[in-house]
A protein has these predicted regions:
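C-terminal "lid/loop" region of Rossmann-like NAD(P)-dependent oxidoreductases
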Residues: 72-83
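C-terminal helix-rich "cap/oligomerization" subdomain common to oxidoreductases
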Residues: 8, 56-57, 94-134
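A generic "alpha-helical surface" signal
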Residues: 45, 86, 90, 110-114
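A short, polar/proline- and glycine-enriched secondary-structure boundary/capping micro-motif
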Residues: 24-29, 65-71
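Juxtamembrane/interface motifs at transmembrane-helix termini
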Residues: 33-36, 76-77, 126-134
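Contiguous beta-strand/loop segments that form the cofactor/metal-binding neighborhood of enzyme cores
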Residues: 1-60, 89-102
């Protein structure tokens, strides 16, 4: 799936997604956060903005330092250190805590609903050939 999204802020996001393509860039392979998948250490997502870019999940923040962003200026990465844990174990522990009433859900039903609305909007836009507003 390839899609372009315009956000409320005016930012434009370009997304290319596949759960079928064989590659080292799958989220679980990149993070190595579970022993179920062999770690490649490759980034699966890149966020690029006017002043900086972020590789994810390796968390290298690329920027021009104190200089104005420009192709002629040196751009350097600053690593952001983060210790990863087994995501599946953390998710099930959190789910159990939510069920027991010890903590609120990190992702709410409203978040899930919006994810579904967005997914359905992508399918509608692709099948109908027009932009879908959310």
């Amino acid at each position: 799936v390839a899609m372009i999204m315009r956000f409320v802020s005016g930012a434009i996001g370009t997304f290319i997604l596949s759960d079928q393509a064989t590659s080292p860039w799958a989220w679980e392979l990149g993070t190595g956060e579970t022993v179920l998948f062999p770690k490649t250490g490759q980034n699966s997502v890149r966020f690029m903005g006017t002043n900086a870019a972020l590789d994810f999940p390796n968390l290298a923040l690329w920027h021009h330092g104190d200089e104005v962003p420009n192709w002629n200026h040196v751009i350097s990465p600053d690593p952001i250190e983060l210790e990863l844990e087994d995501a599946y174990a953390l998710q099930i522990a959190h789910f159990a805590s939510v069920i027991a009433g010890r903590e609120p859900p990190i992702i709410t039903a409203a978040d899930g609903t919006m994810t579904l609305r967005t997914t359905l909007a992508v399918f509608e836009a692709a099948s109908m050939g027009h932009r879908v507003m959310l």
